[in-house]
């Protein structure tokens, strides 16, 4: 697949961020740029506010998360995560 080991760490942090905040990491990144209180989240070492992390929901409940890294940037990583969610019919469609 050609990605470096740092992408494994980044994908894990994106998944952790999506799970712990119950939010799309791309949305968090955008919010952090415009809100000083949200920007404080960037100082939490475990969190990574870059696109590619999505919470997984089934019947409205968060049941896990996915994190994607190494796809060429935050938006391609997010697109890959969305495609993965779409392939699992038991999961709710994410709200965009």
Which functions belong to the PLM regions below?
Residues 1-96:
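Flexible, solvent-exposed loop/hinge segments and secondary-structure transition points
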């Amino acid at each position: 697949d050609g990605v470096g080991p740092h992408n494994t760490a980044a994908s894990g942090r994106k998944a952790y961020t999506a799970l712990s905040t119950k939010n799309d990491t791309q949305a968090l990144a955008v919010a952090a740029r415009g809100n000083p209180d949200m920007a404080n989240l960037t100082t939490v070492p475990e969190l990574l506010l870059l696109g590619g992390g999505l919470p997984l929901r089934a019947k409205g409940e968060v049941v896990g998360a996915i994190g994607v890294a190494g796809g060429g940037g935050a938006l391609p990583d997010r697109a890959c995560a969305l495609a993965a969610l779409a392939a699992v019919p038991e999961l709710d469609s994410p709200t965009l």
